Amino acid sequence: MEKILEVQGLKKTFKLSAKQQKIEKTKTKVKVAVNDLSFTAYRGEVFGLLGPNGAGKTTTLRMLATLIRPEAGDAVLDGSSIVKEPEEVRGKIGFLTSELKLEEFFTPNYLFDFFADLHKVPASEKKQRRERLFERFGIDRFAEVKVGNLSTGMKQKVSLVISMVHDPDVIIFDEPTNGLDVLTAKVVTDFLLDLKSQGKTIIVSTHIFSLIEKICDRVGIIIDGRMVMCDSLEAVCNGKTLEDRFFELYEETVSSGSLGAEGGKEN
């Protein structure tokens, strides 16, 4: 298998305000969001990051997408370093997160044109890609409607289409079905499976077990900013359901006091 993403020792901390310290129930002024995180993803696979809220999944994907810079470590994506060559990385990936909001006074058409031009997509390809993606997600009827007047599900569809405007080979999705109704979530999941069939590499974070089981080839379980296990879905489950295996690993990790032993376990 050909490596397309190699993550080595990523670390990221954040300062906590007094209010955040109260919420976190800690006197510590610094939160370690990601701590010595390493894993590998291979070309054409769907790799899932599974963990509870606050485990460091979103921070990890934001570092991979070069939105924030790691304090230590690096990741090489298709030959480009996220630390040394962030602009090259941005040109190779599509990135979707529900936490990045679209400007509500722009229309889907305007946003598609803006990002297509930003990625220097040729006019002929832009037209064909817009028609195909807008029709696929039912956006064509809302192409000139301001984003602020769209439903939550339609906004997520527009965000998804924009992340694919330049037809990237590597797509990073942070909680892609978060907050969506079941019908829209199915549309998004089916699209991920379609991308998988096209040979795209997908890195996806979620806390939804069924999504991992449905689309992922390999999974990394992340707890408290550390990778506690990383392997094929079959090997991680070890004859059990993913949910049962996750909570088993979680209890083992908490009871051992290690919260993700140094470097994690990857096969």
Question: What is each of the regions a protein language model found here?
Answer:
Residues 146-150:
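Conserved ABC ATPase signature
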Residues 113, 117, 124-142:
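Conserved ABC ATPase "signature" region
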Residues 73-84, 88-89:
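Conserved ABC transporter NBD signature motif
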Residues 230-231:
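ABC ATPase "signature
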Residues 186-198:
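Helical segment within the ABC ATPase nucleotide-binding domain
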Residues 171-175:
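Catalytic Walker B motif of ABC-type/P-loop ATPase nucleotide-binding domains
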